[in-house]
Every structure is written in structure tokens, then in C-alpha cells.
Amino acid sequence: MQRVFILTLSLVMLLTMDVKSRESAIEAVDTENLRVCADPSNLPFSNEKGEGFENAIADLLGEKLNIPVVYEYFPQVIGYVRNTLNKKKCDILIGITAGNDLVLNTIPYMRWSYGMIFLKENGIEVDRPNHPQLADLSIGVQAGTPPTFVLQRYNLMGRVRPYNLTFDPRKAVIGESMIEDLIDGLVDIVFMSGPIAVYYLEKKGYDKSKYQFIPLETTDQGWGRMDYYTTMGV
């Protein structure tokens, strides 16, 4: 009798676990909408107004799947994947670095790099990170980003005007501040993400004839990657 009771109890527990797992699976999948997690203020990638190119990609996916796109917005800072995709708040991240082991990556759809950006009107002739003219220039860089290792390598940190790495993009956009300082002459050259730099320069009326972008190359000199591939993450 005791063995029958134990067997029955075990069966009930297994059935209960199966129901719960199926309920969890149902909650994790929304067949009525394409749930997208994105940064609320990270142009040119995404924002709450749907103005970024990642928003456009999400719209295209929704159109192809014939379902509406709904967003869960969260700043793309430390904990981004943990607080979005891992908590089943969305089905997909439109833009994430290839090789991120917290997600399953799609085939990359974009390659971008960090680089050096300056205005041509200022007579700057820099074409590489060890150019001697850099020793006399004011350099803008976001603290903790890969270009800081390049600047350390060439003993240029004494010329740096640093910008915070950790911030709330809903209150301040560091990339925009860096470009504004470049235009206002507070810095002579900035080391930053190419897509962000070009977006804010052109937003402020500076076309390709007015600025120079020099990509930083990934090398074997111990300063990490300077170029990245972007994928979607699921």
C-alpha cells in the first residue's frame, strides 16, 4: 500500500511539473506579437519613438511575420540581456554583438568599428593612433571603452577629456555630448563608435565633406577588438 501511495504521489508531482513547464513555455512565447527588447535612447540604433535602424529592422520582421511589433525598453547597459531576454520579456534583441554567449546569435548583418573623428576645418592631419600630432590635441573618449587602451598604449591619456561610461541614456546621451564638444572646440578629436559619431555629426549638419573618420584596427598588440559584428539575439 505504501509503495502504491508513493508511486501515485510521484505521478501527481510529475504531472504538476509538466503542467507548470507547459504554462511557462506558453508565457515565454507570444504568437500574437513580435516582442522586441531595445534601448529607449540609443540612436542611430533604437529609441522609444521608433526612429532607429533597429526599429526599422524590427518593423520589417513584423511585416514579414504578419504580426505587430511590441517593445520592452531597457537601457543597453550591464544586465541588459539578463533583465530582458532572460526574463522572457521579449523574443528577440535586434542588435547585439556576435559571439555574446548569453544569447543565440543570428548571422551578422552589420560590421562597425571604433574610430578617430575630427573636423577637417581644423587642419588636423592624424591618420593613425600613433600620429605625433595627437600629443598636442585635446582628445575625447568614453572611459572604459576599447579606444582607451589604444590611448594608454601611446601614452596619450594625459591629453584625454574623459566621458562617463555608466549613465542613464534616458537622461543624457554621451555620444551626442562628445560630438557637441567636438563642434564647440572643447576637444579636437574624439575616439568613439563610428555609427554614433557619424549619426550625430550629420544630425547637426556636418556631411562627409566636413569631417574625417579614421577606423581603428583590431591588432595583436593587446588592446582588444576595435571592430565588431552585429547580430540579432534570441
Where are these regions (language model features)?
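N-terminal hydrophobic or amphipathic helices and topogenic motifs
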Residues: 1-80, 86, 98, 123-127, ...
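A short beta-strand structural signal in non-transmembrane regions
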Residues: 229-234
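Short glycine-centered helix-capping/turn motifs at secondary-structure transition points
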Residues: 32, 88, 155-158, 185
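Bilobed "Venus flytrap"/periplasmic-binding protein-like clamshell domains
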Residues: 35, 40-63, 115-174, 195-196
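Acidic, polar ligand-binding/catalytic clefts
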Residues: 59, 63-64, 68-133, 209-226
